[in-house]
A protein has these predicted regions:
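Conserved helicase motor core of P-loop NTPases
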Residues: 1-83, 89-91
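C-terminal accessory regions
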Residues: 30, 86-194
């Protein structure tokens, strides 16, 4: 499955002239869905960062030099709050000293962190979920909708689309995309009628 998806994404990359800075979004983190965050990140890492050597796989994660990463938890330890969802790029992984040097994208601030902590607090970030992308924007957004994913609501699709500054590309069947556009979150009111 991963090899098939990698080849598929390579074709999309060539067709639309996509770059490493493009953002790939999907709704699912669950591995049972065809397009999920882990599978997309593994495939996109092979495409956009193929030349860097693999490092030790820790916690089922395989970071490389020059990878895109994203915080998966808040950090208040150094007096400067770092939020879940902040993006970074890895400058280097030093196996001898077990250190990762990286730079936060939003402020270009460089930091070092022990490898174990980095692997616990960061994930690959070539792809993320619709919800993790809230508040950010990229020139090119590629939205993957897994086949028969009928539970995605139109407000989630709108959230994903609104992240695009220039182009929004959907990877879906027409039927699945249409089902998502027609479904809406129920409006829940706490107003009591008398």
């Amino acid at each position: 499955k991963e090899k098939e998806i990698t080849e598929f994404i390579k074709n999309i990359k060539e067709k639309y002239k996509l770059e490493k800075k493009s953002k790939f979004l999907c709704y699912n983190t669950n591995k049972k869905y065809y397009f999920n965050v882990d599978i997309l990140n593994n495939c996109l890492q092979k495409i956009f960062n193929p030349d860097e050597k693999d490092n030790d796989k820790i916690y089922q994660k395989n970071f490389k030099n020059k990878d895109k990463a994203i915080r998966n938890k808040n950090d208040y330890s150094d007096g400067k709050m770092r939020a879940n969802g902040e993006e970074a790029e890895i400058d280097s992984i030093n196996d001898s000293y077990h250190l990762v040097r990286f730079k936060y994208i939003n402020d270009n601030e460089e930091e070092s962190m022990d490898k174990k902590t980095f692997y616990e607090e960061f994930d690959l970030n070539y792809a993320c979920t619709f919800h993790k992308s809230q508040g950010d924007g990229w020139d090119d957004i590629i939205i993957f909708i897994s086949p028969n994913t009928t539970f995605i609501k139109k407000n989630a699709i709108y959230t994903a689309m609104s992240r695009a500054k220039k182009r929004c590309i959907f990877i879906s069947t027409k039927e699945d995309l249409k089902k998502c556009q027609l479904s809406a979150e129920p409006i829940i009111s706490t107003f009591l009628e008398h």
